[in-house]
Amino acid sequence: LSYKYYQPANGSEATDNDRYDAMKAAVENGAKVVVCAGFMQTAALQQAAAQYPDVDFIFIDGSPVTTEDGTALTNVAAIAFQEEQAGYLAGYAAVMDGYTKLGFCGGGGGENPACCRYGYGFVQGADAAAAAKDVQVEINYSWQYGASFSASPELQTMASGWYTNG
Protein backbone atom coordinates (compact mmCIF):
# COMPACT_ATOMS: atom_id res chain seq x y z
CA LEU A 1 0.00 0.00 0.00
CA SER A 2 1.37 3.39 -0.91
CA TYR A 3 -0.03 6.84 -0.44
CA LYS A 4 0.76 10.47 -1.03
CA TYR A 5 -0.61 13.50 0.79
CA TYR A 6 -1.95 16.24 -1.46
CA GLN A 7 -2.71 19.54 0.20
CA PRO A 8 -4.64 22.29 -1.58
CA ALA A 9 -2.70 25.43 -2.43
CA ASN A 10 -3.19 28.46 -0.20
CA GLY A 11 -3.56 26.55 3.09
CA SER A 12 -6.42 27.83 5.23
CA GLU A 13 -7.36 30.26 2.44
CA ALA A 14 -7.81 27.44 -0.11
CA THR A 15 -10.61 27.83 -2.63
CA ASP A 16 -12.80 25.17 -4.22
CA ASN A 17 -10.51 25.36 -7.25
CA ASP A 18 -7.44 24.77 -5.06
CA ARG A 19 -9.12 21.71 -3.54
CA TYR A 20 -10.16 20.40 -6.95
CA ASP A 21 -6.62 20.89 -8.28
CA ALA A 22 -5.24 18.78 -5.42
CA MET A 23 -7.73 15.99 -6.19
CA LYS A 24 -6.96 16.22 -9.90
CA ALA A 25 -3.21 15.99 -9.20
CA ALA A 26 -3.77 12.87 -7.11
CA VAL A 27 -5.76 11.19 -9.89
CA GLU A 28 -3.29 12.24 -12.59
CA ASN A 29 -0.50 10.71 -10.48
CA GLY A 30 -2.31 7.37 -10.42
CA ALA A 31 -4.48 7.46 -7.32
CA LYS A 32 -7.33 4.96 -7.42
CA VAL A 33 -8.74 6.13 -4.09
CA VAL A 34 -8.78 9.76 -2.94
CA VAL A 35 -9.61 10.62 0.67
CA CYS A 36 -11.06 14.08 1.29
CA ALA A 37 -11.72 15.39 4.78
CA GLY A 38 -14.16 18.09 5.82
CA PHE A 39 -17.31 19.74 4.56
CA MET A 40 -15.28 22.38 2.72
CA GLN A 41 -14.35 19.72 0.15
CA THR A 42 -17.95 19.33 -1.10
CA ALA A 43 -17.90 21.47 -4.26
CA ALA A 44 -14.47 20.27 -5.39
CA LEU A 45 -15.38 16.67 -4.65
CA GLN A 46 -18.61 16.97 -6.61
CA GLN A 47 -16.61 18.11 -9.64
CA ALA A 48 -13.77 15.59 -9.28
CA ALA A 49 -16.00 12.57 -8.66
CA ALA A 50 -18.10 13.39 -11.72
CA GLN A 51 -15.00 13.88 -13.87
CA TYR A 52 -13.24 10.71 -12.65
CA PRO A 53 -15.93 8.01 -12.34
CA ASP A 54 -13.33 5.21 -12.18
CA VAL A 55 -11.71 6.67 -9.07
CA ASP A 56 -13.20 6.04 -5.63
CA PHE A 57 -13.49 8.99 -3.25
CA ILE A 58 -13.87 8.74 0.51
CA PHE A 59 -15.48 11.85 1.99
CA ILE A 60 -14.70 12.03 5.70
CA ASP A 61 -17.00 14.24 7.76
CA GLY A 62 -19.17 14.89 4.73
CA SER A 63 -22.58 14.14 3.30
CA PRO A 64 -23.37 12.06 0.21
CA VAL A 65 -22.36 13.91 -2.94
CA THR A 66 -24.62 14.32 -5.97
CA THR A 67 -24.38 15.81 -9.41
CA GLU A 68 -26.02 19.17 -10.07
CA ASP A 69 -29.23 17.36 -11.10
CA GLY A 70 -29.33 15.43 -7.81
CA THR A 71 -28.02 12.08 -9.05
CA ALA A 72 -25.91 10.30 -6.42
CA LEU A 73 -22.26 9.89 -7.34
CA THR A 74 -21.70 6.19 -6.68
CA ASN A 75 -17.92 6.53 -6.53
CA VAL A 76 -18.15 8.61 -3.34
CA ALA A 77 -18.47 7.06 0.11
CA ALA A 78 -19.45 9.66 2.71
CA ILE A 79 -18.48 9.05 6.32
CA ALA A 80 -20.12 11.39 8.82
CA PHE A 81 -19.30 11.72 12.48
CA GLN A 82 -22.00 12.14 15.09
CA GLU A 83 -20.69 15.31 16.68
CA GLU A 84 -23.93 15.72 18.60
CA GLN A 85 -22.95 12.75 20.77
CA ALA A 86 -19.64 14.32 21.78
CA GLY A 87 -21.41 17.64 22.36
CA TYR A 88 -24.06 15.94 24.50
CA LEU A 89 -21.41 14.33 26.69
CA ALA A 90 -19.53 17.63 27.05
CA GLY A 91 -22.67 19.53 28.07
CA TYR A 92 -23.76 16.76 30.43
CA ALA A 93 -20.31 16.51 32.04
CA ALA A 94 -20.03 20.28 32.52
CA VAL A 95 -23.28 20.44 34.48
CA MET A 96 -22.55 17.26 36.43
CA ASP A 97 -19.21 18.84 37.43
CA GLY A 98 -21.16 21.70 38.98
CA TYR A 99 -21.02 24.35 36.27
CA THR A 100 -24.30 26.20 35.81
CA LYS A 101 -23.21 29.16 33.66
CA LEU A 102 -22.08 27.71 30.36
CA GLY A 103 -21.03 29.13 27.04
CA PHE A 104 -20.93 27.58 23.62
CA CYS A 105 -19.54 29.30 20.56
CA GLY A 106 -19.99 27.27 17.39
CA GLY A 107 -18.24 28.12 14.22
CA GLY A 108 -14.92 28.28 12.54
CA GLY A 109 -14.50 28.08 8.82
CA GLY A 110 -17.90 29.72 8.42
CA GLU A 111 -21.21 28.06 9.13
CA ASN A 112 -20.81 24.30 9.09
CA PRO A 113 -22.96 21.28 9.94
CA ALA A 114 -20.44 19.69 12.31
CA CYS A 115 -20.42 22.66 14.68
CA CYS A 116 -24.22 22.87 14.54
CA ARG A 117 -24.59 19.20 15.49
CA TYR A 118 -22.06 19.54 18.31
CA GLY A 119 -23.79 22.64 19.66
CA TYR A 120 -27.23 21.05 19.61
CA GLY A 121 -25.85 18.05 21.47
CA PHE A 122 -24.11 20.30 24.01
CA VAL A 123 -27.35 22.08 24.88
CA GLN A 124 -29.30 18.82 25.10
CA GLY A 125 -26.66 17.25 27.34
CA ALA A 126 -26.56 20.26 29.64
CA ASP A 127 -30.37 20.25 29.81
CA ALA A 128 -30.48 16.53 30.65
CA ALA A 129 -27.88 16.92 33.41
CA ALA A 130 -29.70 19.97 34.80
CA ALA A 131 -32.90 17.93 34.99
CA ALA A 132 -31.05 15.04 36.66
CA LYS A 133 -29.51 17.37 39.27
CA ASP A 134 -32.62 19.56 39.54
CA VAL A 135 -30.63 22.76 38.94
CA GLN A 136 -31.05 25.76 36.69
CA VAL A 137 -28.42 26.23 33.99
CA GLU A 138 -27.72 29.36 31.98
CA ILE A 139 -26.18 28.87 28.54
CA ASN A 140 -24.73 31.60 26.36
CA TYR A 141 -24.99 30.16 22.89
CA SER A 142 -23.43 31.96 19.94
CA TRP A 143 -23.14 31.24 16.25
CA GLN A 144 -20.75 34.05 15.43
CA TYR A 145 -18.88 32.25 12.72
CA GLY A 146 -15.29 33.09 12.08
CA ALA A 147 -13.95 32.97 8.55
CA SER A 148 -11.32 30.42 9.54
CA PHE A 149 -10.76 27.84 12.25
CA SER A 150 -8.53 30.20 14.23
CA ALA A 151 -9.85 32.53 16.91
CA SER A 152 -10.75 35.91 15.43
CA PRO A 153 -10.48 39.09 17.53
CA GLU A 154 -14.29 39.34 17.52
CA LEU A 155 -14.74 35.82 18.90
CA GLN A 156 -11.98 36.36 21.47
CA THR A 157 -13.71 39.54 22.67
CA MET A 158 -17.05 37.74 22.93
CA ALA A 159 -15.56 34.84 24.92
CA SER A 160 -13.66 37.25 27.16
CA GLY A 161 -16.94 39.02 27.91
CA TRP A 162 -18.53 35.73 28.88
CA TYR A 163 -15.70 35.02 31.33
CA THR A 164 -15.84 38.55 32.74
CA ASN A 165 -19.57 38.15 33.38
CA GLY A 166 -19.13 34.81 35.11
Predicted regions and their residues:
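A residue-level marker of the well-folded mature domains of exported/periplasmic proteins
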Residues: 1-166
